[in-house]
């Protein structure tokens, strides 16, 4: 039974880490005025009848810190890429010179920065709720396992320690993202 409790603890740790990683991935989607090529990861282009990820059809690079350059391997794709980027809700109008498609990210206004910080806080809070739900799930499983009262208390304390550690880490990552946004 004690091994089962250890397995529950390991499972909870994995779930909490996954929730935290999802939050960090969502943080990457929040634009800070600096160019991040990861925002193009989900963009697909129609390439000779097949839907293909943009990153496989073009060389993507960052220049000047606030500009993404997309140089397709086949220059005939430029109109398709431009059309897809316009429809992608990135909030940026692509510019092209016939060889390269450019996305220029403007610095956010003070009002926009505050809205982005609010979004970061909401993502952070959702992640904390997810971690607390994982904790509750773990506590319920531990209570169902037939353990001595001392062992049950020990594992419940372990779960709480794991939860506290993850919540502190989320707070730290949120503060870092907010600092990044305030400097943008």
Swiss-Prot record:
Subcellular location: Cytoplasm
InterPro entries (UniProt xref): Ribosome_recyc_fac (IPR002661), Ribosome_recyc_fac_dom (IPR023584), RRF_sf (IPR036191)
Keywords from the UniProt entry: Cytoplasm, Protein biosynthesis
SUPFAM superfamilies hit by this protein: Ribosome recycling factor, RRF
Record carries keyword Cytoplasm: yes
Any one GO BP annotation for this protein: translational termination
One cellular component term from this protein's GO annotations in UniProt: cytoplasm
GO molecular function term, any single one: ribosomal large subunit binding
HAMAP family: RRF
PANTHER family from the UniProt entry: MITOCHONDRIAL RIBOSOME RECYCLING FACTOR PSEUDO 1, RIBOSOME RECYCLING FACTOR
Family per similarity comment: Belongs to the RRF family.
NCBIfam families linked: frr
Function: Responsible for the release of ribosomes from messenger RNA at the termination of protein biosynthesis. May increase the efficiency of translation by recycling ribosomes from one round of translation to another.
Protein name: Ribosome-recycling factor
UniProt gene name: frr
């Amino acid at each position: 039974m004690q091994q089962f409790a250890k397995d529950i603890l390991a499972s909870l740790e994995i779930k909490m880490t996954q929730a935290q990683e999802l939050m960090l991935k969502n943080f990457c989607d929040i634009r800070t005025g600096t160019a991040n090529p990861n925002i193009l990861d989900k963009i697909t282009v129609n390439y000779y009848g097949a839907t293909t990820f943009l990153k496989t059809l073009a060389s993507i690079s960052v220049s000047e810190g606030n500009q993404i350059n997309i140089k397709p391997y086949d220059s005939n794709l430029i109109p398709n890429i431009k059309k897809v980027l316009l429809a992608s809700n990135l909030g940026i109008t692509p510019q092209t010179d016939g060889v390269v498609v450019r996305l220029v990210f403007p610095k956010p206004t003070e009002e926009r920065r505050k809205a982005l910080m609010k979004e970061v806080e909401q993502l952070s809070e959702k992640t904390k709720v997810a971690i607390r739900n994982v904790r509750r799930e773990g506590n319920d499983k531990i209570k169902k396992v037939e353990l001595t009262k001392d062992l049950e208390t020990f594992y419940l304390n372990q779960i709480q320690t794991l939860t506290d550690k993850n919540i502190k880490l989320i707070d730290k990552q949120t503060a870092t993202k907010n600092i990044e946004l305030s400097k943008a």
